[in-house]
Amino acid sequence: MTTFGTPLSPSATRVLLLGSGELGKEVAIELQRFGVEVIAADRYANAPAMQVAHRSHVLDMLDPAALRALIASEQPHLIVPEIEAIHTETLVALEREQGQKVIPTARAARLTMDREGIRRLAAETLCLPTSPYRFVDTVEEYRNAIAAVGVPCVVKPVMSSSGKGQSTLRSEADIDAAWAYAQTGGRAGAGRCIVEGFIDFDYEITLLTVRHAGGTSYCDPIGHWQQDGDYRESWQPQPMSAAALRRSQEIAKAITDELGGWGLFGVELFVKGDEVWFSEVSPRPHDTGLVTLVSQDLSEFALHARAILGLPVGAQDGGVIRQAGPSASCALLAHGNGVPVFDNVAEALRDPDTALRLFGKPRVDGHRRVGVTLARADSIDAAREKARVAAAALTIQLQA
């Protein structure tokens, strides 16, 4: 796009966000910097991106009729999926029937909505290195898969996110519990799972890869630590060998070129020495990439907004996005039931080069990420410690 109108006028450039969490909120803010009219949709009211959008809608995005009705009503110029729980076949049909523009493409949204589509594309079509794996539907298939890939292994529903339904099976004593959890933790309820062989990796990274009008660009690699399959800390840059970085970029380019379109992709990789294995890819900003709010001249959200609008991202012809030095993020978690209230915010921000984002989640029921602390320092270890200290200073209460 080279022309932008005025929001809430007939000339407006309209973008529909399908998913309105904390990542969508940051994308909405970046889009509005260019005068884009942002419409936010999700399955619950007052989601974070809804709080900054021009207007919002609550609907079941897995309902094809409801999704079609929303798109027909809003007539967006761009549809930007921000979560996996969307009836992506509807997006594919609308792209084919009406030329509706889906970011990065409707096919990419469909392939990445579950682990099977993207794993088969990576391993079987593109022949990228991955862990050994089996897809299973029944307990018998599940047990046979464990025998084939070996123990330890990882069991995940094909449709889940943020570690829901995911288990690391370390002995045969874990077999029944891992299956039961996978059948209750997925987005679609009981159903198909992937059993993945365990890779003895040194570390795992997210390589934020931007496809844009000027080519493909890469952010510095992001290291991260997960617990129960969910992001807890991330840092940038992750030290790695030149050979491993080069191979990571080759794998990232292969998978993102195949998915096509413009936008930012979060490519997850396992690394051991100079060896690299593909794990997963998200065709949108990644939670581990929250660190880029302080680590880069353009955050992952700014890069995504610029790329999908056809604007320069500041690193043409395959260049690397400018990095601000060792940086880290630490997730803020709330447990229980109620509306989150934060205390000691000033104490959390006491140290220089420390920042905070509170997501505005309207409610916590069980376990939820409600914010993130961010820090820069002279080393990765110092930045991680500073982010942890800031997180520990905050008090989170849940009010009825």
Curated annotation (Swiss-Prot):
Which residues does the record give as Mg(2+) binding sites? E268, E280
UniProt: ATP binding residues: R115, K156, S161, S162, G163, K164, G165, Q166, E196, G197, F198, I199, E204
Please report the organism this UniProt entry assigns to the protein. Xanthomonas euvesicatoria pv. vesicatoria (strain 85-10)
What Pfam families is this protein classified in? ATP-grasp (PF02222), PurT_C (PF21244), RS_preATP-grasp-like (PF22660)
A GO BP annotation: 'de novo' IMP biosynthetic process
Transferase as a keyword?
no
Recorded protein name is Formate-dependent phosphoribosylglycinamide formyltransferase
Q: Name one GO molecular function term.
A: magnesium ion binding
Catalysis: reaction(s): N(1)-(5-phospho-beta-D-ribosyl)glycinamide + formate + ATP = N(2)-formyl-N(1)-(5-phospho-beta-D-ribosyl)glycinamide + ADP + phosphate + H(+)
Q: In which pathway does it act?
A: Purine metabolism; IMP biosynthesis via de novo pathway; N(2)-formyl-N(1)-(5-phospho-D-ribosyl)glycinamide from N(1)-(5-phospho-D-ribosyl)glycinamide (formate route): step 1/1
Record EC number: 6.3.1.21
Annotated residues that bind N(1)-(5-phospho-beta-D-ribosyl)glycinamide are located at: E22, L23, E82, D287, K361, R368, R369
